[in-house]
UniProtKB/Swiss-Prot annotation:
One of its GO terms (cellular component) is nucleus. This is Zinc finger protein 628. It comes from the Eukaryota. Transcriptional activator. Binds DNA on GT-box consensus sequence 5'-TTGGTT-3'. Plays a role in spermiogenesis. The keyword Repeat applies.
Amino acid sequence: MSGVMVGSHADMAPASTAEGAGEKPGPAAPAPAAQYECGECGKSFRWSSRLLHHQRTHTGERPYKCPDCPKAFKGSSALLYHQRGHTGERPYQCPDCPKAFKRSSLLQIHRSVHTGLRAFICGQCGLAFKWSSHYQYHLRQHTGERPYPCPDCPKAFKNSSSLRRHRHVHTGERPYTCGVCGKSFTQSTNLRQHQRVHTGERPFRCPLCPKTFTHSSNLLLHQRTHGAAPAPGTASAAPPPQSREPGKVFVCDAYLQRHLQPHSPPAPPAPPPPPPPVVPELFLAAAETTVELVYRCDGCEQGFSSEELLLEHQPCPGPDAAPQPQEAPAEAPKADQPPSPLPQPPPPAAAPAPGFACLPCGKSFRTVAGLSRHQHSHGAAGGQAFRCGSCDGSFPQLASLLAHQQCHVEEAAAGRPPPQAEAAEVTCPQEPLAPAAPVPPPPPSAPASAERPYKCAECGKSFKGSSGLRYHLRDHTGERPYQCGECGKAFKRSSLLAIHQRVHTGLRAFTCGQCGLTFKWSSHYQYHLRLHSGERPYACGECGKAFRNTSCLRRHRHVHTGERPHACGVCGKSFAQTSNLRQHQRVHTGERPFRCPLCPKTFTHSSNLLLHQRTHSAERPFTCPICGRGFVMAAYLQRHLRTHAPANTPPSTTAPAAGPQPPAPLAAARAPPATQDVHVLPHLQATLSLEVAGGTAQAPSLGPAAPNSQTFLLVQTAQGLQLIPSSVQPPTPPPPPAPPKLILLPSSSAGAGGGRARQGPRAVGKAGQGAGVVWLPGPGGLGVQGAASAGASGTGQSLIVLQNVGGGEAGPQEMSGVQLQPLRPAPEVTTVQLQPAQEVTTVQLQPAQEVTTVQLQPAQEVTTVQLQPVAGQLSNSSGGAVATEAPNLLVVQSGAAEELLTGPGPGEAGDGEASTGVVQDVLFETLQTDEGLQSVLVLSGADGEQTRLCVQEVETLPPGLTEPPATGPPGQKLLIIRSAPATELLDSSNTGGGTATLQLLAPPPSGPASGPAGLPGAPASQMVQVVPAGAGPGVMTPQGLPSIQIVQTLPAVQLVHTF
């Protein structure tokens, strides 16, 4: 039967198995005579066909190629069986179950599942096998024979399939490609396991809880946490005496070995250990995908798709294994007696389990060494970094602590004491954690050498595996053997090339089932899944902070070690990450690779570009909770929040009371009043002090009442002018200079005549209430002119002279002119200079409810006057010439009213008395009207009534108004003074074709007045009335006067713009 099995397994079993079967068919059958010997290796065969088939193993010849796929075979029978895999033909059916097979040998192997026959028994350890290929492979574990060497490296293997898989390392061949993401693998089993990432299949379910797993090894390791029966491969022989004492329990042997390291060694010398058993290498076979899992391990019930996979699977002693005579002696050996190596089987602890999974992150490994290397990434090696809160145990790894704490959870749930050693899988001897002689901590290089044995000779960097060192050496040599065919970019490993090629294909094969995001790479996909689950399996051994991947943990460790391995070659500055170094090098190179698509600005970082792009849009994700302003950056918001609190007031540290009670420093800013009337000039760029009227809604008082005012800064932004609160109070403005005290005197060339002078209006600025100027009419009437006083020592004084337009009655009004003379010394006379609007530093906004209407009052007499400049020279009482100059002012500040001079003129002494009376006010105000902020000329009558006139500049006259004769210098523009409502304009039809004029209403004289000698008599009180031109006194009643405009040219255009 063994010959048939060997012959039928010539292609599927390893070549050495067939050869060995012909050479040594098994202990139950005698070996046939060997007639044909191989000249290469000396092996002998009974048939020439076997020798020919064997020689193709040395030459690598595979003459039989499949027409449907690239596979080739050494024998025709292997090709025949392989083609049945394409056609689906399975002519051999099991009589006990519905399964069918493509070759008779597979059926015979399958029949052993039903019969349970184990015909091949090992003479050294007594293990029994169902198949000869497993038996031959097992014999090589005892002999250490590896007859299949690699021609490219010194490695050797126990069967040809393992050698073929190893050859892929040198050739880079990955024949099994995923149809979804294009990732390729060297073995079909790896491809099937990978495809579960896309399908979400988790076929291995725990019978004790609803958890599912993608690998059976993960399930087996998980079942140990439930306290189930010991999994295959766990300790079955009697442990050493030290381990039989009650102690800590671990899930797998790797945790125990790592836990034993901090313990001090026992005082007596340890007995010599038995010879180390030969542990088979674990590899996954490249089986055909159409074959079902017909090969099942009797120890762990794990199924395999081919005999080679089952052969490579670690043999597990099953419950149906026959008792071995050498299994256990009648009496357990003593502690000082070494166990007999031959009669006993190899120590089971040395045989790894089918798979080892990392508890924190779920990764699985085929060997204990692989799991041990991986677990160093979860915690600090050496030292007791993790301590159990339920007992005094401490562990160097987080995984060990998690496995240990599961024991306490099970004990609490069952209400029983901790499990004893005989019920445990792996037992730790209970020794004191702190030995009598404290063990000094290992040097910093010791853990690295223990955990990372492969060290680079160039830079001293260490690695866990030889492949990591090999890839690292390519950084020093610059070797990039894997080149992209699309763009020519080269990489040091094939996996990096496969990842890079997705940039050209755009394939995003990994899709999140919760949010629908797709990813190109599995690592990004796994990291994204942890964002949903909140899982952070990688914990820092120093501070306990956890991370989602190992790279973040490695970068974080630089914080504790202070390591900055990446140094700049230009300035020597070092960095913890290569990305920071690349960004820093742009400072030296001037590279700014990130360009804004909306403007020519460039940036060195993509984050700066994203922040800049918010300035082009209305996006302001960071909003102030106090005033509602938005900002593009959180730093800008934090800086803005400081403006709401006074700089010298510390933030409140008391707990806020229940309810909407803001902190004390921000009480005034958090609770604005119910209504605010704030009007800001749109062109002003200055510090504004806004007085805000309080409403009904008031903030709760938490301290001294804050002033109901706030200083703002008006700033021009892309969205327009914005008010920004300023915590810096503006300096107190200096007090205004004392206004000059002026009086209008008739010139020395005054004509003869009697009569009393009429008292005209007075001009008053906003700064001086109750101050005034006396206007004396001359022979030519009243006019407006700017002149400089000849008697004044100072220069640049701006004066106002009134002159009549038309001739009037003989008397003081017909004097040639009047002169504005200061009452104080000339240095004290100040000139009012109006600055441009952008130089105004403080603006006091008036309430919007100010009166803006014009009330026209009737008068008894009408005198027509027109405002115009006067050219030429004027004479004064001293006889000196007064040179006229272009006026720079519209308003003249005057002194107090009590210092006004009154009395008869030089030629009027004794003719009558002049009465002081109440003079009229003239001032400018900035008022809020329906049309916005406007400058208004306010005329106050003798009886306290006010008339407001608006001032504006125009290029052309409106209909119905005629331009006066140009008497001033060239370049004059038009200034319109109109009533504040300005709802109607006077046209020629309303006035009979005349021109709009300004009239003075002069009442009859009230009697003589006394005054200083040498001064003319003061005129009587007058009122200003706006009437249409051409209308005589008494022709039109004052109540029916419409709103009109007065046109006057002024040479100083910039003065108009200040209002």
